[in-house]
Amino acid sequence: MTMPTNQCPWRMQVHHITQETPDVWTISLICHDYYPYRAGQYALVSVRNSAETLRAYTISSTPGVSEYITLTVRRIDDGVGSQWLTRDVKRGDYLWLSDAMGEFTCDDKAEDKFLLLAAGCGVTPIMSMRRWLAKNRPQADVRVIYNVRTPQDVIFADEWRNYPVTLVAENNVTEGFIAGRLTRELLAGVPDLASRTVMTCGPAPYMDWVEQEVKALGVTRFFKEKFFTPVAEAATSGLKFTKLQPAREFYAPVGTTLLEALESNNVPVVAACRAGVCGCCKTKVVSGEYTVSSTMTLTDAEIAEGYVLACSCHPQGDLVLA
């Protein structure tokens, strides 16, 4: 089997697939070579073993603890990658993965007091790190608060019995769950909150709220992982974008990233991590004003030529694209 793209050089075989919740599955993979990764990182997956379609998924397993490399995936109605992984991929199939990526990890944090906050599928890197801390920092004081819609939506439900965890459910609450959502009162009740390293993963509004609240409560060590946002509808006014090849003009609202502008107008672009790390969305800007929040993977020569990472490019005016 030929490697579909140099970005995904790791071939892994599906050993088994486990359904976690009504819409989430864990795919357990065998890698016949040593695959280096850190708890909390993610990898790109070549969807249908193609070079054009790559998607980023958290590696939900834990190095030095888990028997398999695992990806835990929520099926999304229009998700190209998630539909393929949860409907079509079967035991014995092969997947191609990239090197592990991302800095959302706990192994470089020197402190031994953690508060891990997760919502929905954002629990995947949290569980990876929770296992790692139990194995490598058994002395660490680790608190976990996990928010779900219903008790049936708890991912890794059996495994959470091994660790102290506060479960919060919005609906259909049963014994062992707190009803509602995460509140400031719940956060304030965490012992020694201000001295903890707080790490969170989940939908963007959830993480933004968490950041605001924990910082107001005195937390200084705060880290969050980005989850992806849906593609917006195409705009008819705002910033103007002129693409030279093929020739076309389109618009996007002020404040959007270049990637959001491209995707909302159905301009072909490969995007995987959406966090300025993987380099998939490299795009050349011919003219126009913009700022960038990441240039990882770009060489000095590429930057000088006008290349940007579309996910990390913030147009300040009209742009002309190659």
Swiss-Prot record:
Chain intervals for the UniProt region annotation (Oxidoreductase): 111-213
UniProt key word Iron-sulfur: yes
Leader sequence segment: none
Residues annotated to bind [2Fe-2S] cluster: 273, 278, 281, 311
Tagged with keyword Flavoprotein: yes
PROSITE patterns registered for this protein in UniProt: 2FE2S_FER_2 (PS51085), FAD_FR (PS51384)
Cofactor, how bound (note): Binds 1 [2Fe-2S] cluster.
Record SUPFAM superfamilies: 2Fe-2S ferredoxin-like (SSF54292), Ferredoxin reductase-like, C-terminal NADP-linked domain (SSF52343), Riboflavin synthase domain-like (SSF63380)
Key words of the record: 2Fe-2S, Electron transport, FAD, Flavoprotein, Iron, Iron-sulfur, Metal-binding, NAD, Oxidoreductase, Transport
Annotated 2Fe-2S ferredoxin-type domain residues: 237-322
Single annotated GO MF: metal ion binding
CDD domains in UniProt: fer2, FNR_iron_sulfur_binding_1
EC class: oxidoreductase
Main function: NADH oxidoreductase acting in concert with HCP.
Family, as annotated: In the N-terminal section; belongs to the FAD-binding oxidoreductase type 6 family.
Protein name stated in the entry: NADH oxidoreductase HCR
UniProt source species: Escherichia coli (strain K12)
